Design a protein with these regions (language model features):
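Beta1/beta-strand and adjacent pyrophosphate-binding region of the FAD-binding site
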Residues: 1-10
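Glycine-rich FAD pyrophosphate-binding loop
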Residues: 7, 21-41
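Predominantly flavin-linked oxidoreductase catalytic cores and closely associated redox partners
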Residues: 9, 105-237, 275
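N-terminal Rossmann-fold NAD(P) dinucleotide-binding loop
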Residues: 13-14
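A short alpha-helix-loop-beta-strand transition element characteristic
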Residues: 35-37, 54-72, 164-167, 182, ...
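A conserved beta-strand/loop capping segment in the N-terminal third of enzymes
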Residues: 46-49, 53-101
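FAD/FMN-dependent oxidoreductases across multiple families
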Residues: 218-293, 298-301
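C-terminal helical "tail/cap" subdomain of flavin- and related membrane-associated enzymes
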Residues: 298-347
Length: 347
């Protein structure tokens, strides 16, 4: 029996696995995609994320960097016509390579890693959870805890809550070409005509990346054409046809969708737990939540012991309380800047 089975090999799952494996716990990570896996993400690491990653995994290897590898921060172009700078040095990385590095470090520490294998079902029992895996490594295994780190539409959350998640769809394309924007910034746009949620443009190696977040998936292509036209007209974008595109789902943050850390022996972390900062910054909250879960388990049970679930959940919730409050404060700040997000002032 495993101490913990983790669904998803993103930042939340990998940091949990690394910390617990280092401490002698038996951990399995199941990732439905082959690795390295493509993941739609800005790949911008704020200083908080850099600090947590390097404390847990060691120096971030240059192989995961994109150019310009130093990012100066965010320029937020609001729906009121103002531009609000959020300055702060960040690292610009390829998310696929970052995740591959962290999951390999977790495996080297002793975690069992199954790629191309997904959690298809689970059954909670009195002292453990039976987990059904499907894919490359099909099996039925037992664990004292199941941790869902597989996103707002992931299997763990969907089965636990018995309903579809409430989420934002993201769509971004990668182009060759030129644009009159400072490549050292991540540019975000809140104008209503460009998206009913947000839009963005950034540079990574030889690519200009253009994306939108939308309330309804069917609107993604329509709004994406609008941001492309806007960039051509206002920033002299001269872009090739897209080399490739990516879609993803993110939790819709709001009073109706509070942070949700799971129930019973089923725990949630990262965006599966509705932890996400404005402008789709979710790596830091994923790392913090995975770290908090690992530390909570280490405080409540030794390797091979069954934890007191009530105490474990209490420790996990308390450890995240300041992070959740800070996250909500950031959304309230956005609500004060942008009428589009004004309802989030109720958080």
């Amino acid at each position: 029996m495993y101490d913990v089975i983790i669904s998803g090999a993103g930042p939340a799952g990998c940091i949990t696995a690394k910390l617990l494996a280092d401490a002698g716990y038996s951990v399995l990570i199941a990732e439905k995609m082959p690795v390295p896996r493509n993941k739609s993400c800005s790949g911008i690491l704020i200083q908080k994320s850099v600090g947590i990653l390097e404390h847990t995994f060691g120096k971030i290897p240059h192989a995961v960097y994109a150019e310009p590898h130093l990012n100066k921060g965010l320029l937020l172009h609001t729906d009121t016509g103002t531009t609000v700078p959020f300055d702060g040095l960040c690292l610009n990385v390829w998310r696929s390579l970052l995740d591959y590095w962290t999951v390999m470090e977790a495996a080297d520490a002793g975690a069992v890693f199954f790629s191309e294998t997904s959690v298809r079902g689970f059954l909670e029992k009195e002292d453990h959870v039976t987990v059904r895996l499907d894919g490359k490594c099909t099996s039925e295994l037992s664990a004292r805890i199941l941790l869902g780190c597989d996103g707002p539409a992931g299997t763990v959350r969907s089965i636990l809550r018995k309903k579809p998640g409430d989420y934002i769809t993201t769509f971004q394309t990668y182009h060759h070409g030129d644009i009159d924007l400072d490549p050292a910034y991540f540019h975000a746009y809140l104008q209503l005509e460009l998206s009913d949620y947000d839009a963005w443009c950034s540079v990574k190696d030889d690519y200009v990346i253009v994306g939108v977040g939308v309330q309804h998936a069917l609107d993604a292509n329509r709004y994406h054409k609008k941001i492309l036209s806007f960039l051509a007209e206002n920033h002299h974008a001269r872009l090739s046809a897209p080399e490739f595109s990516e879609r993803w789902l993110l939790p819709r943050i709001g009073p109706e969708n509070p942070v949700d850390l799971g129930d019973g022996r089923i725990f949630l972390a990262g965006d599966a737990a509705h932890m996400l900062n404005p402008m789709e910054e979710g790596i830091s909250t994923a790392l913090v939540s995975g770290n908090a879960f690992a530390e909570a388990l280490m405080r409540t049970a030794a390797p091979g012991e069954n934890p007191d679930i009530s105490r474990l959940r209490s420790c996990y919730t308390f450890s995240l309380s300041s992070t959740v409050e800070h996250m909500y404060q950031l959304w309230k700040l956005l609500a004060g800047i942008s009428p589009k997000f004004s309802r989030l002032g109720e958080l």
